[in-house]
């Protein structure tokens, strides 16, 4: 443990001395030391043209999620609880699910139903409905218009339970889910893009628990391609054109294994691999 602390301290000191960009400020503190924060998201939720912050708290233990409002100068002196209940939340992405011009919130919860909160346009969020199953271990949400109807849909990543696609009914409601993949896929994150250039969005799943990562191809999401090793224990995935060849590549971040970039080719394959970072960490 001492070695890890020293490494982190040296790394932080080096970054600070070289750039001197990041400084702590009392008004920049979000939440308390007791908060079990899983993730944050940022967007202008109250329409005043600055970025506000949504904090997802709890993980496995129910806590209150929070909205922190920007004062226009990058400080967050005012906050509000999201909803009346504490939840076991992992992620709260924001998007305009009903196309009324403001950002709504989608809450991903562990071992309880996920939630939709709709914005009244002024940053007040009213609970609208639940979606998903009560026993699902939701870890992440991918928000994207899969069926090209102009409304965002929700792809739900559930750890060791069925993953689902929830299509928007054009009114911001998500009722019946479409299952895809294995029933016990241990998915943590999902990213989406048209990887094989056929006009349909595909889904890349970051899996843990000794499971391979997978690519599921649209529009039906039955056909899949295995990506990486079952020893990767992947925690995150991103998609971008890393080598500027006009073809999308896939980046995975792993625990106990090297992080990887999988370079795509014109046939939609990802055979060329470049690893980055080292495991185990060097001892200083």
Language-model features: where?
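Sec-dependent N-terminal signal peptides
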Residues: 4-13
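Blade-edge motifs of beta-propeller repeat domains
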Residues: 17-35, 69-87, 118-136, 167-185, ...
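Beta-propeller blade termini
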Residues: 38-47, 90-99, 118, 139-148, ...
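Hydrophobic beta-strand segments that make up the repeating blades of beta-propeller
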Residues: 53-58, 105-109, 154-158, 203-207, ...
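Short glycine/acidic-enriched loop and turn motifs that connect beta-strands
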Residues: 58-62, 112-113, 161-162, 209-211, ...
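A generic tandem-repeat structural signature
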Residues: 87-95, 101-112
